[in-house]
Swiss-Prot record:
GO molecular-function terms, A-Z: rRNA (guanine-N7-)-methyltransferase activity
SUPFAM superfamilies xref list: S-adenosyl-L-methionine-dependent methyltransferases (SSF53335)
Pfam families the record matches: GidB
Organism of provenance: Pseudarthrobacter chlorophenolicus (strain ATCC 700700 / DSM 12829 / CIP 107037 / JCM 12360 / KCTC 9906 / NCIMB 13794 / A6) (Arthrobacter chlorophenolicus)
Subcellular locations according to the entry: Cytoplasm
UniProt keyword terms in alphabetical order: Cytoplasm, Methyltransferase, rRNA processing, S-adenosyl-L-methionine, Transferase
Phylogenetic classification of the source organism: Bacteria, Bacillati, Actinomycetota, Actinomycetes, Micrococcales
Protein name (Swiss-Prot/TrEMBL): Ribosomal RNA small subunit methyltransferase G
Length: 216
């Protein structure tokens, strides 16, 4: 069983509520089969809660009730599965191109009984038109200049991108500003999330998208 500190437990209880047992089970999947199949490095096991699960799950506070969420490059389900557990009101599509990861994700979804999750094997750019999303999430996929092109088109013209980023978020926004505007991004900001829950809060880039409709 993966150890959880008192502070991490308090944060997890706040975020997951009565679904905390599902979150714990998910963490066990990450620590066992997730590590065995190369989705998570073995050195990450002691910090699965702090660096991965809680770090991702806190962004649920930024997602409107009942949203359809597409998680790009879902990998080990970070943040997609964290959001599905914390927020049963959300409808999640996990977009992941690698078959071995897709198989693992589906196994975890089935084991946890998450009926608000669809796992899709696809590259993000090929999923456009096949996914309906109000919010697109991503973590550690690529630089924001590239990430904008992978995420914004999935919104179909309006919605939000919420990307978990590091300390260079502001610098990335400057470099990506032109690409974001071209794709329909009207407002881009850096947010700090979970500062009242986590020792190291999560930095996210939020892109509000409202692409003008083409005149017929």
């Amino acid at each position: 069983m993966v150890d959880i500190t008192a502070a991490e437990l308090r944060a997890a209880e706040k975020i997951f509520g009565d679904r905390l047992d599902l979150a714990k089970r998910y963490v066990e999947h990450l620590a066992t089969s997730g590590t065995e199949r190369g989705l998570i490095g073995p050195r990450e096991i002691p910090r699965l809660w702090s660096r991965h699960v809680l770090n991702c799950a806190v962004i649920e506070s930024e997602i409107p009730q009942g949203s359809r969420v597409a998680d790009v490059g879902s990998g080990a389900g970070l943040p997609g599965l964290c959001l599905a557990i914390a927020r049963p009101d959300l409808e999640l599509t996990l977009i992941e191109p690698l078959e071995r990861r897709v198989i693992w994700l589906q196994e975890v979804v089935d084991d946890l009984g998450l009926d608000n999750v669809t796992v899709m094997r696809s590259r993000a750019e090929l999923a456009v038109g096949h996914v309906e999303a109000d919010v697109v999430t991503a973590r550690a996929v690529s630089a924001l200049t590239n990430l904008a092109g992978l995420t914004i088109p999935l919104l179909g013209g309006t919605g939000e991108v919420i990307a978990i980023k590091g300390r260079s978020a502001g610098e990335e926004i400057e470099k990506a500003a032109k690409a974001i505007r071209k794709l329909g991004g009207v407002e881009t900001s850096v947010l700090t999330v979970g500062d009242n829950l986590l020792e190291e809060p999560t930095t996210v880039v939020r892109i509000v998208v409202n692409k003008p409709q083409k005149k017929s």
